[in-house]
């Protein structure tokens, strides 16, 4: 199809800059904002406080000013009878001088500013008043364009014209992609109307109708794909049935349980137990804030696997966390006849062979490890239950590799201490059932979060000294600037020396990203064992590191960290019985968004509230794990952070389809399955599941 205004040059720019290669992709390049152009102002009404406005009048004359060889400026003096404004061009001067005529009537649209005592519009949008009627104008769309596009004359207005021409060329009614039994009960407009109204709404209401329809459709097919994948997976993979709770679980529960379980822990154990007993493979995400007792729930679930004659495995993202899990589990199971082994990159030689042999014979009951666990040389006699700690560090492919270690896929429990907002969990982890531990063990004191400016360091140092003299330990974290490790290291070294001078009486550990793993582990271990009182680090301290005696977390230049990062760091303290503190140190001048982050941290310790706020401030694209999750979604118009109700609405409708046609064979749903197949084949990759 030929489209006026779309020559080879523009086609190439759209492809290079916006990755638009088809008419469909152009149609799905939506405006990012709209401006109401239904009103004409007079020049006498103008004010510099006004946003974009439009005026109607005539060009009186042109003047060209030259300031140096390359600095030209074209000014058109424009009047509507109530006053005079200047229309100014610094680029495209020849085009403007050639196109716009003196004494012809135009509608001018732009942002009024003042220069030399007179209102001016720089690079305004100009329409011939004889061809543009006020009733046709309505809401003007604005499209994102790159600098290279602007230099080539392809600004928002050019995209707008292309969209208008394309819509005029298209068939009278675009084919529908949602059936009436979905569209009508939800009062959605047709797909054809939605495309026409999204690019050319006459009113704000028309724009909202179009956005709702297009957002819903996008999210519906994402959810349908996820739920279909989960449904297929459940049918395809029969799981081991754990029919009994025996001596391992009961001995632990009656003799070794260190404290009473919270109601949330009991609820989650019941959910896991029901999955294990169902005969289908469990795929469950366990969310719980730092210190909520996820590891204990995972351990008790592993003991049920042991009671049914199976082995269990827990995968951690780093060696230090794997070692910590090993220590914790051994302490929990003290006196119970369970063989627990560690398998990481540092376990080599004869010791490694012993562990591998024990796994192959079934003599090793619980294996704790890192990525080393999924190597081909690791073979289990009967692997029945797998715990994956901190899912965002592992991909779906790595999870799936564990399934190949057993005749039937083992039950999988994915744990994360990074709270995931519900709408995002539905999209990223939509193939997993979700359990939440939403209460902390009783008696734990909430961490107090305090904001201090970098001009208040003297009083901060005094507070740190008092805590250490009372027998506590302190973390001090320097920010990591990814682009400049050398500067980070210099900052850390200088900061470390300053701290040594401030605290000559205390012992300090230092950890940074350029250290060899064994040196980093050794320094961390000194702090864990209490040999040093202060740990100074330039990298984020590993999630899960447990030092109950550490009561103060100082985060320097806290404005450089995201909300989730700050919350994770704060979670390193507050693990003992003593009152703990998190001190956020920033410069005095803060951007509004940064101040919001700091205020949220000081207001709440609730990880789910923080995750929701973080999602709204940053959007889902920045959240760790969205790409590793197996759902690579590139939503064109929907926003997971702000469209929670539409996500839920889309999931409800998708679930109805899956319930009615789990095998995708019924003729009344053929339209949906065909559309889903189309989306998965095309470059609309939000429907792809790895």
Outline where the language-model segments fall:
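Accessory helical-bundle/CTD segments and flexible terminal tails appended to RecA-like ATPase motors
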Residues: 505, 524-534, 541-548, 553-556, ...
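Conserved pre-motif I regulatory segment
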Residues: 9-13, 240-286
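Helix-hairpin-helix
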Residues: 1-18, 103
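Inter-lobe coupling/hinge segments of SF2-like helicase ATPases
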Residues: 270, 281-599, 663
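Short, surface-exposed secondary-structure boundary micro-motifs
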Residues: 58, 111-112, 225, 558, ...
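Upstream accessory/linker segments immediately N-terminal to the RecA-like ATPase cores of bacterial MutS
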Residues: 65-256
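OB-fold nucleic-acid-binding modules
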Residues: 29-59
């Amino acid at each position: 199809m030929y489209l006026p205004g779309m020559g080879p040059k523009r086609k190439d720019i759209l492809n290079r800059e916006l990755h638009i290669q088809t008419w469909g992709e152009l149609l799905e390049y939506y405006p990012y904002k709209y401006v109401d152009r239904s009103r004409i102002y007079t020049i006498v009404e103008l004010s510099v406080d006004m946003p974009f406005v439009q005026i109607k009048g005539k060009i009186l004359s042109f003047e060209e000013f030259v300031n140096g060889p390359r600095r030209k400026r074209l000014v058109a003096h424009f009047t509507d009878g109530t006053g005079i404004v200047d229309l100014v061009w610094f680029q495209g001067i020849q085009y403007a001088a050639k196109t716009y005529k003196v004494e012809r009537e135009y509608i001018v649209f732009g942002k009024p500013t003042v220069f030399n005592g007179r209102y001016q519009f720089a690079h305004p949008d100009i329409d011939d008043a004889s061809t543009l009627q006020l009733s046709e104008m309505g809401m003007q769309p604005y499209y994102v364009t790159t600098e290279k596009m602007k230099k080539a004359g392809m600004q928002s207005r050019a995209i707008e014209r292309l969209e208008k021409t394309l819509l005029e060329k298209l068939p009278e009614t675009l084919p529908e992609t949602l059936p009436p039994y979905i569209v009508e009960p939800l009062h959605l407009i047709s797909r054809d109307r939605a495309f026409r109204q999204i690019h050319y709404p006459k009113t704000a209401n028309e724009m909202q109708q179009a956005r709702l329809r297009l957002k819903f459709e996008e999210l519906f097919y994402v959810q349908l794909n996820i739920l279909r994948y989960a449904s297929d997976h459940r049918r395809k993979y029969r799981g081991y049935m754990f029919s009994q709770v025996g001596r391992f679980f009961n001995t632990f529960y009656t003799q070794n349980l260190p404290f009473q379980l919270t109601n949330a822990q009991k609820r989650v154990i019941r959910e896991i137990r029901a999955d294990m007993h169902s005969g289908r493979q469990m795929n469950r995400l366990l969310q719980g804030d730092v210190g909520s007792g996820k590891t204990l729930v995972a351990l008790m679930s592993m003991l049920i696997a042991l009671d049914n004659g199976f082995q269990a495995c827990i995968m951690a993202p780093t060696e230090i966390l794997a070692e910590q899990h090993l220590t914790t589990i051994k302490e929990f199971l003290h006196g119970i006849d369970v063989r627990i082994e560690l398998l990481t990159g540092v376990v080599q030689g004869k010791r490694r062979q012993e562990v591998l042999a024990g796994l192959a014979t079934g003599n090793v009951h619980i294996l704790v490890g890192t990525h080393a666990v999924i190597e081909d040389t690791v073979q289990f006699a009967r692997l029945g239950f797998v715990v994956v700690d901190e899912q965002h560090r592992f991909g779906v492919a790595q999870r799936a590799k564990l399934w190949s270690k057993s005749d039937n896929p083992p039950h999988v429990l994915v744990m994360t201490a990074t709270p995931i907002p519900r709408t995002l969990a539905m999209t990223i982890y939509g193939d997993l059932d979700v359990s939440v531990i939403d209460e902390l063990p009783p008696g734990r004191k909430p961490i107090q979060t305090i904001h201090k400016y970098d001009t208040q360091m003297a009083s901060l140092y005094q507070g740190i000294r008092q805590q250490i003299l009372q027998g506590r330990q302190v973390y001090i974290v320097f920010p990591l600037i990814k682009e400049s490790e050398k500067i980070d290291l210099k900052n850390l070294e200088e900061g470390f020396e300053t701290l040594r001078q401030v605290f000559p009486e205390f012992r300090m550990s230092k950890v940074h990203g350029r250290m060899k793993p064994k040196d980093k582990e050794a320094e961390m271990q000194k702090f864990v064992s209490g040999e040093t009182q202060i740990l100074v680090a330039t990298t984020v301290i590993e999630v899960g590191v447990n030092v109950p005696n550490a009561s103060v977390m100082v985060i320097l230049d806290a404005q450089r960290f995201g909300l989730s990062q700050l919350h994770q760091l704060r979670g390193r303290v507050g693990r003992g019985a003593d009152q703990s503190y998190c001190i956020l140190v920033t410069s005095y001048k803060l951007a509004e968004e940064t101040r919001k982050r700091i205020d949220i941290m000081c207001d709440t310790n609730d990880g789910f509230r923080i995750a929701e706020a973080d999602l709204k401030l940053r959007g889902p694209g920045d959240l760790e794990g969205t790409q590793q999750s197996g759902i690579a979604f590139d939503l064109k118009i929907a926003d997971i952070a702000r469209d929670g109700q539409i996500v839920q609405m889309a999931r409800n409708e998708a679930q109805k389809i899956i319930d009615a046609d789990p095998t995708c064979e019924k003729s009344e749903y053929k339209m949906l399955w065909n559309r889903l197949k189309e989306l998965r084949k095309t470059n609309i990759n939000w429907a792809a599941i790895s």
